[in-house]
Amino acid sequence: MATANIAIKQNSSTNIAFIERMPSPSLHRILYNLFSKFSYSLSNSCHFNLKCLNFVMNRMFHMSMEDLSQCTILIVDDSPDNIAFMSQGLAQYYRIKAARSGKVALEILAQYPIDLVLLDIVMPEMSGYEVINQIKHNPHTEHIPVIFLTGKSNPEDEQLGFELGAVDYVFKPVSIPLLKSRVHTHLQNKRSKDILLNQNDYLETEVLRRSGELDRMQDAVVFALASLAETRDPETGNHLLRTQHYVKVLAQRLATTDKYRDVLSPTVIDTYFKAAPLHDIGKVGIPDNILLKPGKLTPDEFTTMRNHALLGKLALEKAEKLSGACTALINVAKEIAMGHHEKWDGSGYPLGLKGDDIPLSARLMALADVYDALICRRVYKEPMSHEEAKAIILQGRGSHFDPMVIDAFLIEEQNFIDIAQKFADEESAMVPIQLGQQASG
């Protein structure tokens, strides 16, 4: 049996991986090596990023604790004497802003970055409770700590203040040493929370960045694996690109129907798109004298050729088990590899599945694969026009193909034509034809 090892060369600008053939180990070992290298790269990258993150966060923490003098305190009290007294006690440690009413306080909060609010409860026009309620319901100020200033000690009032979001109470007449201690403590707490928020923002950004990199790496690996099988047959050209786009437009159309609206989410459709190139990965295990035979296959040869569906699924299963990389992508790839030659009426292979027992991903791939084979030149046939291919596909309605997939194809046939032309093989192995144009000959 002729098999092939691979060397992968990735174009950094396109993330498309190309295959070079070499003498070979087993297919599942190739898959395992690729998935293992992928996982190793991820592990090293994450370890490096966590070390960098710890260094950055430690630096941020120490710098932040040393820099509380840059914090701004807003004192809100209707008494000018109280404002002057507290300002004098805090001004040498922090920046101070003051307001004699709740309305002015809210205006200051809307214009300036404030780190902590000292808020009198009993004020004319607008009480401290009303002010804190607005502060805590504004996403731009809800994180600012508020310390209530009050001339009376009442447990019910204190409970209400804490329920509204206050972090502390300071009783009048105010003790400056006590006030400084409370302010310093809550500024430290706020700065720690700010650091955590910054850390979370950093992590979210880093996760998104790394996820994007891993998605692109995964796409490159998938296309590399698929290309492994395609390099066995020099006539397949851009078959992988065309069929994955056919599958995508079919899935997007079915997603508008009642039956599949809740099944075909954008994420699922993207997984179908990425897994589609692996549909014929099992062909790497088919001998060249059968795979590339220009004439009709004998019954025994056809039996061997049919094995590629099972070989593909088994190779993916083996790689999945060895690498521990169980993902939606691999699961869909197994469905497509195993099921894209099944037929709606149960006459397909390898399991003879019927109707909805055939995975939807495989039903979409079945039509995409047949359509592309019909419109492309092969060693045993000339390319058909779109209309000729369409006629054959329509003949398979309810027998070869899912009727709903046929309906989607009819609606999207101009997109099929556009995809075929966009990803046409370099040697013009397809017949260019516009929708409705009649085939010649």
Swiss-Prot record:
InterPro entries reported for this sequence: CheY-like_superfamily, Cyclic_di-GMP/3'3'-cGAMP_PDE, HD/PDEase_dom, HD_GYP_dom, Sig_transdc_resp-reg_receiver
UniProt keyword annotation of Hydrolase present: yes
Domain Response regulatory positions: 72-187
Induction context: Transcripts are more abundant in biofilm cells than in planktonic cells.
Keyword Phosphoprotein in annotation: yes
Residues recorded as bearing 4-aspartylphosphate in the entry: D120
Name of protein: Probable cyclic di-GMP phosphodiesterase VC_1348
Annotated organism of origin: Vibrio cholerae serotype O1 (strain ATCC 39315 / El Tor Inaba N16961)
